[in-house]
């Protein structure tokens, strides 16, 4: 490899000068990312039961909110400066089917939560929802399954319908 002199630096590429990052202030000065609360989307889990908050055992510190508690929880997040939330349902197992029909119910947990939040906050908070079938399917797959295979075309048709039933909430996506 050919070396050449760089004024004030020395022989490049043998000597490659770089900014010293030993001190916190220099690391912060040259950091590529500066994350703030305004960069986050809070995942909010909702359930249809009577308890306002239900712990999620697999995620310590995370709770599922009832439909009447989710507005208060999101209100606190808005006060903290969190600009957007994403709603994820904990669908009652009795409503889960192989064809995930509950996904297309305009009164499913996600639709109810989004309507309440839109009414409470208008456009002051971004509202997102996962366009997915796994919360509604009895087999846990994110698609329609027949004979062990996910049927992509049939799944896409249902996902498009899912988007359309969410449209009245005017999601921020």
Where do the PLM segments sit?
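N-terminal amphipathic alpha-helix/helix-capping segment at the start of soluble metabolic enzymes
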Residues: 2-52
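Single conserved hydrophobic/aromatic residue that forms the stacking wall/gate
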Residues: 130, 163-173
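Alpha-helix-loop-beta-strand connector modules within alpha/beta enzyme cores
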Residues: 98-129
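Catalytic domains of carbohydrate-active enzymes, especially glycoside hydrolases
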Residues: 69-89
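N-terminal small/glycine-rich loop or linker at the start of catalytic domains
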Residues: 35-62, 128-150
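Acidic, His- and aromatic-enriched active-site or binding-groove loops in soluble protein domains
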Residues: 107-115, 148-160
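Short, well-ordered coil/turn segments that N-cap beta-strands
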Residues: 37-40, 81-83, 121-125, 170
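Glycine-rich, proline-tolerant flexible connector loops at the mouths of alpha/beta enzymes
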Residues: 54-64, 82-109, 136
């Amino acid at each position: 490899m050919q070396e050449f002199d760089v004024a004030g630096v020395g022989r490049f590429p043998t000597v490659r000068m770089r900014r010293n990052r030993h001190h916190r202030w220099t690391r912060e000065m040259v950091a590529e990312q500066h994350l703030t609360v305004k960069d986050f989307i809070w995942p909010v889990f909702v359930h249809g039961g009577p308890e306002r908050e239900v712990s999620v055992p697999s995620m310590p510190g995370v709770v599922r909110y009832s439909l009447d508690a989710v507005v208060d929880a999101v209100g606190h997040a808005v006060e903290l400066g969190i600009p957007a939330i994403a709603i994820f349902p904990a669908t009652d197992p009795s409503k889960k089917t192989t064809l995930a029909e509950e996904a297309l119910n305009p009164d499913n947990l996600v639709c109810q939560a989004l309507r309440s939040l839109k009414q409470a906050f208008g456009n002051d908070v971004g509202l997102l929802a996962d366009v997915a079938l796994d919360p509604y399917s009895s087999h846990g797959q994110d698609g329609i399954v027949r004979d062990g295979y996910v049927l992509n075309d049939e799944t896409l048709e249902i996902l498009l319908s899912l988007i359309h039933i969410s449209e009245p909430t005017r999601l921020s996506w």
